[in-house]
């Protein structure tokens, strides 16, 4: 399982190439509607590779995974936010990476701060800092 919420709209996510059986993400990270999320469950030969136990039962919606009425306006809003984010994915990645690098360069001037993982592959908008030893 992967919670891809922080990656959504920042890097390309291809569930066919990603080695996960379950992936979740939330619309608000794309400036979409709050309270709207997506759940991807990998299928092989038309069957889910992971079976989920419903937390809310009743009704036949959501393939029996969750009861209740679909939030159609929220789902449409999530789709539109994803469409817009995809159009600006590369420019947003570069912008965030530039801001992160600037932030870390400023922090590097402080003796009491250690920046962790600078040489590691990482998301363009994530910094990891700690007190210097």
Per-region residue spans from a language model:
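Pyridoxal 5′-phosphate
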Residues: 1-133
